[in-house]
Amino acid sequence: MDTIKETDSFSKYQIGEAVGKGAFGKVFKALNAETGDFCAIKQIEKTIISEKQLPSIIQEIKLLQTLQHPNIVKFIESYETSRYLYFALEFIEGGSLAKIAKRYGCFQEPLLSRYFSQVLKGLAYLHEKGVIHRDIKSDNILITKEGVIKLADFGSCTYSAIDRKLTVVGTPFWMAPEVIQMDMNARSTACDIWSLGCTLLEMLTGNPPYWDLGTMPAMFAMVNNPHPPIPNNISADLKHFLLACFVRDINKRPTASQLLEHPWIKQHIHEPSQSQPASSPEPSRIKSSGSGSKLSINTYAEGYDVESDDDTTNSNNGSDHDRIQQLESQKKEMTETIKRLKLHFLRAMKEKKVMKDMISQLVTERDEYMIKLGLTPPPLPPILANATLNSKSSLDSSNELLNKESSQGNLLGSGGSGSPYTNHTRSSSAPLTAPGKIISTHQIHSPSLSNSSASASTSGVSNNKERGSSILTNDFFHPPSDDDQHSPTNDLFLHEHFEKNLKVTASSSPSSLSKNSRLTTKFELESDNNTNNNNNNNNNNNNINITTTTTTTTTTPASNQNLGAYYQSSGNLHLYTNQNNLTNNNINNTNNNNNNNNNNNNNNNLGSNTNVDMYLRTSSEKTHLSITQPVSLSGALSYGDHLNPSVTIGGHNSLKQKGSGKTSIPVLQKEPSNKSLNSLNNNNVNNNNNNNNNNNNNNNNNNNNNNNNNNNNNTNSNSNNNTNNINSTNNINTNNINNVLGTSPSRKISNSDQFTPNRKSSQPIAPSFSLLNQSLDRNPNSNNNNNNNNNNSNNNNNNNNNNNNNLNSGSNSFNNNSPISSFTNNNNNNESGDEYDDDSDIIEDEQSSNSSLSFNNSNVPQVESVVVNVQPPRVGDECKVKCGDGWYDAVVDLVSGSTFVVTIKPFKIKREVSHSDVTLAPLQFPVTATKKKKFSLFNRK
């Protein structure tokens, strides 16, 4: 050891042999050369103490010098060198209880009661001074020759007024659970009580609890078991004493002063009187007073009943008084606990409401975005679907209560020695409880969501459930109704034939038509008051008055029971009639004398020429041309000289007026979009030119030869300009991609074709035909060979013949331009079945050719596999898809869950693909060995 200088005060001690060794160093027996008394010198290495901790420890040791108690080893003085700390302590000759137990065996209960009563007195003194021993065990309990117990080994002692102490705070087998768990709030005098119980078990059994398990398992068992195992061969009082020491709640664990009043301690303290035999001493009852009553001990251990002294009235009165005080204390504690629980519950309610509002806002934004993308939003989360939001009044009251309780700031008691929840002294370095008041440190400001927003989200989700389950249906890819801030309430369809005499009146100028405006068009059938009606089959030469008005609000179709229509900006013009009108097959209306004048006035009201983009939809994927189901048509409805190239025609969703020009028959032109004719499965539209020309003869009751000539001339003009001989095609072939009936291969695309943009939906394309020159028969097995010549009252046979000749002339010129045979019903599902040779390509207009390359979804094979560059695929990524035997370019349009949608570029169709079919090929795509065959729009002769 270091040499102590002679000039130092510690040089008076002469160091002798070592009498012990601890975790911090050795203990030597020393002689005080000045007094001749023996003392113990404890040597501690400074290397185990950090420089920051050293000053506080020195101060703590000096404070320990002030401790003076008969059951505590006297601390004499300390000394410091460069390597060690020296403590001069009172020397105890008897040694420790561990050595005595090892030498003489286990102790009996009476002797243990005497010894531990002195230990409790020493602990009570230390705890009153604020000192926590932290290492109570048999090795640190010394005994003199007279049998006096002394608490020693303050190497791990801490003074509770200093923040940090020595690193070693006990031995694992004697440590309390809160110390093992390193609970900073548990650094109190209660840990010495737990260690005292473990030391008592050591004296009874010879080993501390869980000694046979080892260090780590013993610590685990100490934390998880309710209490250490208690021997069965002990008295009930001792068992009760041990259970009181092993109470896990530090607030309910008794103090050393309270344990001194335990019956097991008291019954062995007294000295037996001479009159009483020593064999059967009866313990004397010591009256309890203050906090150390025997009643308070009973509250710490279950199942133990202390016998009451029925002969002592004062003792009973004292017990009742203590019991009343205890009950009042428990009542007060329960009241405070309930108040704290209520506060936390209200705070949790408020935070839950804020969380629901944030989730509701996120769900609403997600649903709106998915609807715009055409996706079906998922159902609401359970927190919004099942739970109901609290009312505003309850939330306001909870906020008021929170503010009130926060302002009081006394709901949670401080962790000092004056805390009403425990009698143990805590270390000031770590508070036992939370701060004294609960104050909201920050206010969460989230965007407020009203109940209407949440309900809007719910309704939005419910409305989207009406969509089809498959994301590849036509309704799914159709433009959503809210794109233009309005949507029609229902879709009705045109069930009658299109052979109508149209009278259109536009009440608003084109400049007044905006994106958010809607045109409500009413179709009315003029009744015929004349009696000169011939029995013509399916001759619907009706006069239709069309009145167009502009409104900025959502309107419903006209209430007319015969025929109606409405205009939608995102989906062109919708025409429809009721099903009841289908039975009126024979409507033979004749015109009055002023038929020509009416037609002229009609054209004047339209501003000479008016173009209306229009289409009709069906609710099913396939269109069957039957009399009971509507047909889906699409195109541009043109009034007047719409084929004049010098006139600029309004594009998609427009109802615009052009310059003045001569009036002509309205013609529905083909829309130039890559749409497929949606399953018009081999339905024949048999149109005979001669019969249709006869149908277009508007006969007058009086002498109307000139009127008929004008009418037929207009028809011929439209026939020549509008692809000539519109009715020359007999059958529609769904697999031959061309959807135009009788279209000349060398024709130029009309103005309506050029300015009508593509729609997003996969709607079927209607064939081009004249509303007056074409009668659409919905029966595929019937021919339109009807002699619908309405004879005039003055026998205008010559005029009719001239009209027919004019029409036939148009048909002949059509045949001269391109000798095209009528379409056949050869359904070929192979996409490469139709071929054409480059030398025989008769299509002159490239735009017309490209615009008609549309495919039916049923003709393209299903996607078997997909090759992408990035996994998982993202929207806009290029990829390759395998359909049948070929690979095609595609692009990813939508990604949703386990599937995503790709658009196959050559076919302009969409396919839904599972992620399981995707193959990652970052370097190259599959290459097909065979050249992809081309499609022919027309069959070669």
Curated annotation (Swiss-Prot):
Instruction: Give start-end positions of Acidic residues composition bias.
Output: 832-847
- Keywords annotated in UniProt: ATP-binding, Kinase, Magnesium, Metal-binding, Nucleotide-binding, Serine/threonine-protein kinase, Transferase
Q: Which residues does the annotation say bind ATP?
A: V19, G20, K21, G22, A23, F24, G25, K26, V27, K42
Q: Which cofactor does it need?
A: Mg(2+)
InterPro entries this protein is in?
Kinase-like_dom_sf, MAP_kinase_kinase_kinase, MIP_CS, Prot_kinase_dom, Protein_kinase_ATP_BS, Ser/Thr_kinase_AS
**Low complexity bias: start-end ranges:** 272-294, 446-463, 529-556, 681-739, 779-831, 848-857
The annotated active site, in chain numbering, is D135 (proton acceptor)
Q: What class of enzyme is it?
A: transferase
Bias class Polar residues marks the residues at: 394-405, 420-431, 654-663, 740-778
Give the observed phenotype of the deletion mutant.
Cells have an aberrant response to waves of cAMP stimulation.
Any one GO BP annotation for this protein = intracellular signal transduction
UniProt protein name: Serine/threonine-protein kinase DDB_G0283821
